[in-house]
A protein has these predicted regions:
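Short coil turns that delineate tetratricopeptide repeat
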Residues: 6, 40, 74, 108, ...
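Conserved alpha-helical positions within TPR/SEL1-like repeat arrays
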Residues: 13-21, 44-55, 78-89, 112-123, ...
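TPR-repeat structural position
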Residues: 25, 59, 93, 127, ...
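S-adenosylmethionine/decaboxylated-SAM
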Residues: 274-433
Length: 433
């Protein structure tokens, strides 16, 4: 570094930028530090150090330097946007949202800020506002592939399948190698042959995509050809959670109906249910599924703390799926707030109407078993039980699946699997009491 000893501040900064661009981050950091020792208010060094630390995943340091840069230049839209990204990674959603809003106020044509704000709003359950943000980003930049993709995902989550399909196709038109769009497009379809065709295109682009390979074998199985799946069972993918899940389904006495997304799945279940009865849902979160189901049944009972998971589950941390204590306002919905072990004994101590369907979306073994035990009073031969995460995830045999089988073993019940949606992890059954 001695040869850099007599460089001016500007020369040192320019050298730091060169090292930064060549991904020599350690040297770049040292040079930016030298600039700041001479000039603590050097905007370029502050901003670039923030970018450098952000790239390294050192978000707390990145936050400090972005805040210093913004203090010097409050109208720096890019810095506000980048700080918003950092806050999002740190789990500070409201601060993240505020940063993106500031970036947009400074520069209304900042497409990235509109897209990022849309993602935060989606995380907060404000889907309609998120849609508006993604559409604004696309209006600014019609070829903004991530905005099209994010818009598709919101439509998919809301059950607007045709809009989602149109957006996924637009993503693929812009970027034919966008594999996630192919994957989600095949989920949004409702036809085995069409879904299989999409997966084949995906696999042609990425022949190491294990999930695509497994799902192609499933669809072939549903068409009567189990050769590919049998090959999977003899391969290194035999212990993949998808393979284990499908093996269980294929071992059932009767192959259940298959659907590709939660809304087609729910439509099929609702069509088989007693619509004159109310439904029950254990695990409401933001109420998206509850709202969809109640459009048919008009009356529903929902149980949740509305503060998220009580403990870590799968790859989700404690507090995931939180609605921040806010109870959804849904016409016809009656919500019982609190932990199942606290609220269910009192609720079911009174006579309750038999259930048309019960949606178990509690994820955890203990919570699901608790809900099953207490809701048994409203279950009869006509009730359909839906388990929202029964299969496909890493430890599926230890959670809702375990709770269901333990519940049935304890009471001497059997069950018939009637509908399955592999890609949304959902299974619908009827008990045989």
């Amino acid at each position: 570094m001695n040869k850099n000893k007599n460089l001016t501040i500007n020369q040192t900064f320019e050298l730091a930028v060169q090292k930064h661009q060549k991904n020599n981050l350690q040297v770049a950091e040292s040079l930016y530090d030298k600039v700041l020792k001479v000039d603590p208010n050097h905007m370029g060094a502050l901003n670039n150090l923030a970018i450098l630390f952000q790239a390294l995943g050192e978000d707390q340091k990145a936050k400090i330097y972005y805040e210093k840069a913004i203090k010097l230049k409050p109208n720096h839209a890019i810095a506000h946007n980048n700080l918003g990204i950092v806050f999002n990674k740190l789990g500070e959603d409201q601060k993240s949202k505020s940063c993106f809003e500031k970036a947009i106020k400074i520069n209304p044509n900042h497409a990235d800020a509109h897209n990022n704000l849309g993602n935060i709003l989606k995380q907060l359950g404000e889907d309609q506002k998120a849609i508006s943000c993604f559409e604004k980003a696309i209006k600014i930049n019609p070829s903004y592939v991530n905005a099209h993709y994010n818009l598709a995902n919101v439509f998919n989550r809301l059950g607007e399948s045709q809009k989602a399909i149109s957006c996924y196709k637009k993503v693929i038109e812009i970027d034919p190698n966008f594999t996630e769009a192919y994957w989600n497009l095949h989920v949004a379809t409702s036809n085995i042959d069409e879904s299989l065709s999409i997966l084949k295109k995906l696999y042609k682009i990425d022949n190491k995509n294990t999930k695509a390979k497994i799902m192609m074998s499933v669809l072939q199985g549903y068409k009567g050809n189990f050769n590919e799946f049998n090959n999977l069972l003899a391969s290194s993918d035999s212990n993949h959670p998808y393979t284990r899940s499908i093996k269980w389904v294929f071992s059932l006495p009767k192959l259940p109906k298959i659907f590709f997304n939660r809304w087609d799945f729910f439509d099929a279940v609702i069509a088989l249910s007693e619509n004159s009865r109310p439904f029950y849902e254990f695990g409401v979160s933001k109420g998206i599924s509850f709202q969809y189901i109640i459009n048919t049944f008009k009356k529903g009972f929902g149980f949740d703390t509305f503060t998220g998971l009580p403990e870590t589950w799968d790859a989700r941390s404690k507090g995931s799926f939180s609605n921040f204590g806010s109870v959804p306002k849904i016409e016809g919905g009656e919500f019982i707030v609190g932990k199942f072990e606290d609220t269910l004994p009192e609720f079911f101590s009174k006579e309750r109407p038999k259930a048309s369907l019960i949606n178990f979306d509690a994820d955890l073994y203990s919570s699901t078993l608790c809900a099953l035990n207490y809701s048994n009073k409203v279950i009869d031969e006509k009730t359909i039980l839906v388990f929202d995460e029964l299969i496909m995830h890493k430890n599926w045999e230890k959670d809702e699946y375990r709770a269901l089988n333990e519940f049935c073993d304890n009471l001497g019940f059997g069950y018939e699997v009637i509908v399955v949606s592999f890609l949304t992890w959902q299974v619908a059954i009827k008990l045989k009491k």
